[in-house]
């Protein structure tokens, strides 16, 4: 029996030694997660950087709840008068992001629309009543301002650099759970066609957003603001079913910052106008499908007409940038300033 056991053990030991000698000739990869710089196991630094700039927003408005049916009695109306309509306070919540040391906060227009009172709660526990600086329903964005010292404006990313697959984090106030954080990736870019606003150019992500998250921050892995969480795509498509299905949409920060600056400086968003109506046409360049703009209408004595553009002209480039997506190009035109000279190639 001893000889049998020895004969079984020795070949096994020999095989292990041989394998060790062979493997020693190769450079083995480092185990995953050993180096924090190689594999990101935590986004706590990014969250710590951005969270002080994210606020909870609470709104209240008086709504008419109808007439008390008892006041339909003519005898009661004789003594109490005809002011029998009742009002009640309707409360709502949302999120916002501090963009300037002066207390300017970007949020969604639908968060604060028609509110009679707006209260902002900061991460450090302080609170303040907010003033509405301006709103832009065309992008569903609004700017508030609070008067508190020591505010921390968030650092802005460049949303034009965002790529599908990038890790993102959503920070907001879902159902009143303030400064909640969820993680996901960018699932798509330049989403539109939802008829939620006039200028749709959303970042799609699967980072969880729920009721109360609107107006909150979508940040990148370094803690910089990439977008403003705006919409939740629900199973029913009408917002009645709020079950999360992993499709959440954020307004890019480049657009949000443009809107914020105009609302602060002018009280409204000043958009460029060429005086043209266009149709989007699909073209096929080799194997790539592109969109171009064909002029289908001209405003009399408008900028385009004065520049010599004609009906049927196809816009190929604006300021040297090839038109690959007609919708995005029209958004870029809207961001131009009145009086700014534009080079249009047809």
Feature roles, as predicted:
Residues 1-29, 45, 131, 145, ...:
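C-terminal recognition in membrane/secretory proteostasis and scaffolding
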Residues 10, 88-96, 154-158, 204-219, ...:
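Gly/Ser-rich catalytic serine loop of serine hydrolases
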Residues 25-45, 49-105, 113-116, 126-127, ...:
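Glycine-biased strand-turn-strand hairpin within the trypsin-fold
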Residues 37-41, 49, 64, 145, ...:
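Soluble non-cytosolic domains of exported or imported proteins
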Residues 43, 115-118, 151, 171-184, ...:
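Active-site loop architecture of trypsin-fold serine endopeptidases
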Residues 91-93, 98-179, 193, 201, ...:
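Conserved active-site neighborhood of the chymotrypsin/trypsin-like protease fold
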